[in-house]
Amino acid sequence: GAPDRLEMLLDKRVVAMADYDREHGTAYLQTAIMSVRFPGSPADAAAALNVHRNTYFYRMNKVRELFFIDLKDGDDRLALSFSASIMEGMEK
């Protein structure tokens, strides 16, 4: 069906991040999304997440380490943004 076709479009790293967050009570996906939403402004991204800047930087390092997503890379930013939007739509 349609959800199956949509799932094929998702970046596997983003799906893995969402699964990891669910299993471990972390917020890596939301942190990465805020990084894309507030490009070049870690302070604004941290404020949107209601966390200290150091917490934001720690999480972003974990995103790179655990999921091999570098949000300084345009393709990775696009993959995250696109996949997160589809996943959000599938939850509704």
Walk through the language-model features, giving the residues of each.
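Cytosolic nucleotide-utilizing catalytic cores of signal-transduction proteins
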Residues: G1-K92
